[in-house]
């Protein structure tokens, strides 16, 4: 618990993202929690895991836990989006989270989805100079962000450019993407902690969680009129979901 009595809420981004995706909701969370948004290994400012370590959700969770311990945080509330939601669920499984709120988490599909035929990040990396110029055009920028948000026009131009270029430049993208597509989340024997699974009704990337992939007792919410990463679509709705999902005392 922070000096102001607020409990820590760890915020984890999705594949190709960075801690910046949480910027629209940080101020809304600060009245009730001590929000801490961090970059996952291989994204944003964080170096990837060691070459011999598969960047699976479980291994990313272990790395995040070590970072929390270094900051003096033992069992925070944890919230994540997409891959970050899966990492949050793995932290809960390992006993490293007091509660979990996962927004459109990856991994809750029926079976491993396999590798994509076309590596879009590789092509975008090769065309980076052209993409960078195109991002200054509002219409093109919003088209690039349309799978990310239901309302890309609500993402400020500077933030939109950072999102796309951050995805292109993420050194950990390939490995994490491969690992994500190779595994599924296993809810067997999940600890009895509060778990909220929230899905944007306009999510164009990931469908709702398969019933057999949901931890026993998990609460399921459908978030109206928002997409895969809804922090710009409706910051107030996202903040309320995170505050409600973490409305239990931090475990000792």
Across the structure, where does each feature detected by a protein language model lie?
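Conserved HGGG/HGGXW glycine-rich cap/lid loop of the alpha/beta-hydrolase fold
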Residues: 2-47
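Conserved loop-alpha-helix segment in the C-terminal half of the alpha/beta-hydrolase fold
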Residues: 27, 194-226, 232
């Amino acid at each position: 618990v922070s000096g102001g009595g607020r409990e820590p809420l760890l915020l984890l981004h999705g594949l190709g993202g960075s801690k910046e995706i949480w910027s629209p909701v940080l101020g809304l969370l600060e009245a009730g929690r001590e929000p801490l948004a961090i970059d996952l290994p291989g994204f944003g400012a964080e170096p990837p895991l060691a070459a011999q370590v598969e960047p699976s959700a479980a291994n990313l969770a272990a790395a995040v836990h070590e970072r929390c311990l270094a900051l003096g945080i033992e069992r925070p509330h944890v919230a994540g989006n997409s891959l970050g939601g899966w990492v949050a669920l793995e932290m809960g499984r390992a006993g490293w989270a007091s509660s979990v709120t996962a927004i459109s988490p990856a991994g809750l599909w029926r079976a491993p989805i396999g590798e994509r035929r076309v590596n879009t990040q590789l092509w975008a990396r090769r065309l980076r100079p052209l993409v960078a110029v195109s991002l200054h055009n509002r219409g093109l920028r919003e088209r690039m962000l349309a799978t990310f948000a239901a309302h890309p026009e609500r993402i400020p131009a500077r933030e939109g450019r950072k999102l796309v270029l951050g995805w292109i430049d993420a050194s950990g993208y390939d490995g994490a993407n491969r690992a994500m597509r190779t595994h599924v989340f296993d809810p067997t024997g999940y600890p009895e902690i509060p778990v909220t699974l929230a899905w944007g009704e306009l999510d164009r990337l990931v469908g709702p969680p398969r019933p057999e992939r949901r931890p026993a007792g998990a609460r399921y919410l459908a978030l109206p009129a928002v997409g895969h990463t809804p922090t710009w679509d409706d910051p107030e709705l996202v903040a309320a979901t995170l505050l409600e999902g973490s409305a239990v005392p931090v475990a000792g």
